[in-house]
């Protein structure tokens, strides 16, 4: 019976499965002529969960993990080009979080999946940092960026490597469980390379010393972090964070690595009978494609650290066409940002194609990659943006090639002129 009449004449509803009345349970859910209580629902869930095999298809159990194609599609919205790097990153990150799902359900005798940290190599301004930031936004996981140049060995002035984990905890409001599945991006990893190929007899506290300190953190260790960001002192309770499941992405420009690669790939003999080879001038992109672990070790990374970053993604130098795309296409493109700024003054911004190419050429000459685009456009518009708030009848600002190349003032189209035209 799902319902009975009480002494007062009111109908009392009962669970069709366990027979408890609506007053004995928190919730009673009605179906067609039947009812089920919250306790029976919980019991059914437990039975289903227990009977689900450990090797069940991941697609059935995952709810919030995007596929590699979905991850790459999000990256495409913010980062122009760099297709191989985006594909490598998407697959590596997807496999990492798939591994975590597997670990939660795996039996003792099951295959153990190990972590694959990532190393991004590419010239300055090619999109390494932007890729990592967009990745974290896509996955909705705790994310922190650390600068390797500020790190020193424990006991010296500077940041300890454990400060990175402290920042990760801060980013997720000190939820240890969430932090243990986050992403850490360590920028400028090439700046902590040791100063010579041979181990030094003097102490290198910001180079090889930091690499040694990063080893266990990247591989997986229990890091002791002071609660709420305080300083370490004796008799203090520490938060214990297991870094085994934290994905580490390291990035760097590795300026000079191309010479190490060329010396290895274009080695020629000496003496009268040796074959004389002419040195080919190769681009950074071509050189970085041939990078091997031995090149990174020769550059100054210690072998143990190179071994802990098995996934290496190289980013290409940006071409003129790619820089023009970066100016206009991404969701947060520089041109869109300046158009928005001028629209707040009631003014339209038109940047002609010849001007876009001129900006790209100038950025290439500066060798600053995509970072140089904003400063070039800002420089061209600074005087106009200074005068615009006081001008009441400007309808449009037009930037052409001469504005960029010859530093001429942009063309101002006034409302009266616009109406006549």
UniProtKB/Swiss-Prot annotation:
Record bears the keyword Phosphoprotein: no
Highest taxon listed in the record's lineage: Bacteria
One Gene Ontology biological process: cell division
Alphabetical list of Gene3D superfamilies matching this protein: 1.10.8.60, ClpX chaperone, C4-type zinc finger domain, P-loop containing nucleotide triphosphate hydrolases
Domain ClpX-type ZB: 3-56
InterPro entries given in the database record: AAA+_ATPase, ATP-dep_Clp_protease_ClpX, ATPase_AAA_core, Clp_ATPase_C, Clp_protease_ATP-bd_su_ClpX, ClpX_bact, P-loop_NTPase, Znf_CppX_C4
Entry keyword annotation includes Zinc: yes
Keyword set, alphabetical order: ATP-binding, Chaperone, Metal-binding, Nucleotide-binding, Zinc
GO MF annotations, alphabetized: ATP binding; ATP hydrolysis activity; ATP-dependent protein folding chaperone; protein dimerization activity; unfolded protein binding; zinc ion binding
Residues annotated as binding Zn(2+): 15, 18, 37, 40
GO cellular component: HslUV protease complex
Binding site for ATP: 123-130
Assembly, per entry: Component of the ClpX-ClpP complex. Forms a hexameric ring that, in the presence of ATP, binds to fourteen ClpP subunits assembled into a disk-like structure with a central cavity, resembling the structure of eukaryotic proteasomes.
Job description of the protein: ATP-dependent specificity component of the Clp protease. It directs the protease to specific substrates. Can perform chaperone functions in the absence of ClpP.
Family: Belongs to the ClpX chaperone family.
Name of protein: ATP-dependent Clp protease ATP-binding subunit ClpX
Gene: clpX
């Amino acid at each position: 019976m799902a319902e009975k009449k009480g002494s007062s004449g009111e109908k009392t509803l009962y669970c069709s499965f366990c027979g408890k009345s609506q007053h004995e349970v928190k919730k009673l859910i009605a179906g067609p002529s039947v009812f089920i209580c919250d306790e029976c629902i919980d019991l059914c869930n437990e039975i289903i969960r227990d009977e689900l095999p450990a090797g069940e298809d991941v697609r059935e159990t995952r709810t919030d993990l995007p596929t590699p194609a979905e991850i790459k599609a999000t990256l495409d919205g913010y980062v122009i080009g760099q297709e191989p790097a985006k594909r490598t990153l998407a697959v590596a990150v997807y496999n990492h979080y798939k591994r975590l799902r597997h670990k939660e359900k795996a039996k003792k005798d099951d295959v153990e999946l190990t972590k694959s940290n990532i190393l991004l190599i590419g010239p300055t301004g090619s999109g390494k940092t932007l890729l990592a930031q967009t990745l974290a936004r896509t996955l909705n996981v705790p994310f922190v960026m650390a600068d390797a140049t500020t790190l020193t060995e424990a006991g010296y002035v500077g940041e300890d490597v454990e400060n990175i984990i402290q920042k990760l905890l801060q980013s997720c409001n000190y939820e240890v469980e969430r932090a243990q599945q986050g992403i850490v991006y360590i920028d400028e990893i090439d700046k902590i390379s040791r100063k010579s190929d041979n181990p030094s007899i003097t102490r290198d506290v910001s180079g090889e010393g930091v690499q040694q300190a990063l080893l266990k953190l990247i591989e997986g260790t229990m890091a002791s972090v002071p609660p709420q960001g305080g300083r370490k002192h004796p008799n203090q309770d520490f938060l214990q964070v297991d870094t085994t499941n934290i994905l580490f992405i390291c990035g760097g420009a590795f300026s000079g690595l191309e010479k190490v690669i060329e010396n290895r790939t274009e080695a020629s003999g000496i003496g009268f009978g040796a074959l004389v080879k002419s040195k080919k001038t190769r681009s950074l992109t071509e050189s970085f494609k041939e990078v091997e672990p031995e090149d990174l070790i020769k550059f100054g990374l210690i072998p143990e650290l190179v071994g802990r970053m098995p996934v290496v993604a190289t980013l290409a130098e940006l071409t003129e066409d790619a820089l023009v795309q970066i100016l206009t296409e991404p969701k947060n493109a520089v041109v869109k940002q300046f158009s928005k700024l001028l629209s707040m003054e009631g003014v339209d911004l038109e940047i002609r194609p010849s001007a876009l190419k001129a900006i790209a050429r100038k950025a290439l000459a500066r060798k600053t990659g995509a970072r140089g685009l904003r400063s070039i456009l800002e420089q061209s518009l600074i005087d106009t943006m200074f005068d615009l708030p006081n001008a009441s009848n400007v309808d449009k600002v037009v930037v052409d090639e001469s504005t960029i190349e010859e530093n001429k003032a942009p063309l101002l189209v006034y409302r009266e002129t616009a109406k006549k035209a």
